[in-house]
């Protein structure tokens, strides 16, 4: 009878908390969105499955060695950790002390937990290697660079301004997060506000990279918000685009793009990297990988490498990136008031970025002889190529013969560059404070 009772008590179901149950449902929702609705399935499917694995009771797949020790709640072991941190031998007190401790001290406590016989779960290891090191988003950016054609941007350099204007959503959201904190509605630190703001760039890898550096505790919510809203671009953007433009403006036909030479395409990534990195070194990792991937594509001499980066490598890294993000979908980190704030601020960021791009195009038309269709301004958010397709679709609704796709790809690509630069600005000034 005792053995039967022990068997029942050992069932994971007996240890399932309300928070874990909610997160399992959230993870199933992400899987449904990925499979049934095809919302960014390449990321939401592994993120959702990672969330399932992270919330299995007693499995500890997303826990570090130290977190496993704290979950085990052995009084003698807690006393050893507490003595090192000079706090009470209580789980909550130890967690509070760890939150304030230097990274070196946190590393020492992790090593101490390993010495006591604990080990990190597989998802925690994935997270440390893929996101903790920053390597996975950078490799993704290399792949994106290899798939990007700078031709439309080089053919119409003015569209760079549209990509820059759309980044206003990032900085507006940072101010929004700090405003919520100022009025005591939801608590956000400056690094957290900066990490949330990058959602407005509509660039998943950049959002994950910056969150991993500035606010890893919010990474799960930020990544889910970023990719969910990227999938919802066809629903979010058109009402804003139509509200800010007249029917006449939506029918503007732009001049045919010129042919961009091979030399221009080869020189551009190198020149872009040097110009930006010499002024803003913190943007060099993201922009460097992006430009390197593009140079492999345009040079024409490393087709095997370019093909590998565009396909096999980016697909492999995407799997581990998604599972690593899923490791952060644990109840005690995701089910917080901050998550609601992130979801609200995220959609505001998209709306502000879209509006800023459209309004910049209208402003440019005041001073320009060759008119720009304001609809392509919304493509300044770097959801490539979805935002450009939305611009083209809304344009065709106004004029069935007005094809804007290639024109919209200019600001769309510029948005990728802009989000990387914005991330560099955040890193430089937030980490320096």
From Swiss-Prot:
Q: Which InterPro entries match?
A: OadB_MmdB (IPR005661)
- Name the coiled-coil region(s): none
Q: What are the GO MF terms of this UniProt record?
A: decarboxylation-driven active transmembrane transporter activity; lyase activity
Any GO BP = sodium ion transport
What are the subcellular locations of this protein? Answer: Cell membrane
PTM per Swiss-Prot/TrEMBL? The N-terminus is blocked.
The entry's cellular-component GO terms read: plasma membrane
Which stretches are transmembrane?
A: 16-36, 122-142, 159-178, 180-202, 222-244, 266-286, 308-327, 339-361, 409-431
Q: Which cofactor does it need?
A: Na(+)
Catalysed reaction, written as an equation: oxaloacetate + 2 Na(+)(in) + H(+) = pyruvate + 2 Na(+)(out) + CO2
Q: Does the keyword Isomerase apply?
A: no
Record's keyword terms, sorted = Cell membrane, Ion transport, Membrane, Sodium, Sodium transport, Translocase, Transmembrane, Transmembrane helix, Transport
Q: What is its EC number?
A: 7.2.4.2
Q: What superkingdom heads the lineage?
A: Bacteria
Per the record, membrane topology reads:
Multi-pass membrane protein
A Pfam match = OAD_beta
Q: What does this protein do?
A: Catalyzes the decarboxylation of oxaloacetate coupled to Na(+) translocation.
What is stated as this protein's family in its record? Belongs to the GcdB/MmdB/OadB family.
- Subunit architecture: Heterotrimer of an alpha, a beta and a gamma subunit.
Annotated protein name in UniProt? Oxaloacetate decarboxylase beta chain
Give the organism, scientific name.
Answer: Klebsiella pneumoniae
* Classification of source organism: Bacteria, Pseudomonadati, Pseudomonadota, Gammaproteobacteria, Enterobacterales
Q: Which gene encodes it?
A: oadB
């Amino acid at each position: 009878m005792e053995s039967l009772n022990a068997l029942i008590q050992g069932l994971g179901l007996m240890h399932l908390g309300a928070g874990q149950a909610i997160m399992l449902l959230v993870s199933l929702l992400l899987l449904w969105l990925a499979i049934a609705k095809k919302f960014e399935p390449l990321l939401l499917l592994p993120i959702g499955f990672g969330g399932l694995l992270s919330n299995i009771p007693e499995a500890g797949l997303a826990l570090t060695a130290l977190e496993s020790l704290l979950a085990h709640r052995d009084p003698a072991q807690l006393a050893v950790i507490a003595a090192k941190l000079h706090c009470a031998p209580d789980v909550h007190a130890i967690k509070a002390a760890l939150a304030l401790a230097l990274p070196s001290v946190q590393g020492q406590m992790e090593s101490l937990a390993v010495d006591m016989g604990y080990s990190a779960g597989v998802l925690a290891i994935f997270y440390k290697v893929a996101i903790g090191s920053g390597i996975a988003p950078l490799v993704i950016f290399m792949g994106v660079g290899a798939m990007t054609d700078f031709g439309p941007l080089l053919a119409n350099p003015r569209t760079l301004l549209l990509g820059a204007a759309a980044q206003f959503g990032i900085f507006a959201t940072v101010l929004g997060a700090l405003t919520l904190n100022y009025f005591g509605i939801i608590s956000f630190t400056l690094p957290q506000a900066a990490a949330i703001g990058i959602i407005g760039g509509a660039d998943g890898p950049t959002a994950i990279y910056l969150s991993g550096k500035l606010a890893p505790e919010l990474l799960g919510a930020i990544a889910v918000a970023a990719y969910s809203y990227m999938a919802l671009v066809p629903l979010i953007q058109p009402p804003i685009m139509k509200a800010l433009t007249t029917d006449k403006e939506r029918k503007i036909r732009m001049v045919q793009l010129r042919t961009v030479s091979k030399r221009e395409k080869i020189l551009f990534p190198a020149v872009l990297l040097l110009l930006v990195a010499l002024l803003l070194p913190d943007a060099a990792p993201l922009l460097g990988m992006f430009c390197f991937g593009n140079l492999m594509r345009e040079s024409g001499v490393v087709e095997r490498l370019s093909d590998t980066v565009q396909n096999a490598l980016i697909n492999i890294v995407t799997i581990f990136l998604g599972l690593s993000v899923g490791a952060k979908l644990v109840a005690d980190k995701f089910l917080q008031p901050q998550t609601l704030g992130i979801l609200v601020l995220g959609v505001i960021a998209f709306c502000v970025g879209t509006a800023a791009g459209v309004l910049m195009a209208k402003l440019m038309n005041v001073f320009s002889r060759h008119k720009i269709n304001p609809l392509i301004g919304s493509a300044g958010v770097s959801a490539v190529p979805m935002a450009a397709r939305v611009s083209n679709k809304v344009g065709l609704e106004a004029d069935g013969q007005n094809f804007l796709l290639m024109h919209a790809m200019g600001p769309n690509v510029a948005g990728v560059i802009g989000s990387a630069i914005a991330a560099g600005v955040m890193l430089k000034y937030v980490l320096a404070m």
